[in-house]
Amino acid sequence: LRPAVIVRTKGK
């Protein structure tokens, strides 16, 4: 997964 995707998943 892309770093941006990981950040969005953790941000939720």
From Swiss-Prot:
Similarity comment:
Belongs to the frog skin active peptide (FSAP) family. Hyposin subfamily.
Please tell me the species this chain comes from.
Answer: Pithecopus azureus
Residue list for modification Lysine amide:
12
Output one GO BP term: defense response to bacterium
Q: Is-annotated flag, keyword Glycoprotein? A: no
Tissue pattern of expression reads:
Expressed by the skin glands.
Question: Where does it reside?
Answer: Secreted
Keyword terms, alphabetized: Amidation, Amphibian defense peptide, Antibiotic, Antimicrobial, Secreted
One GO CC term of this entry?
A: extracellular region
Q: What does this protein do?
A: Has antimicrobial activity.
Name this polypeptide is given: Hyposin-H4
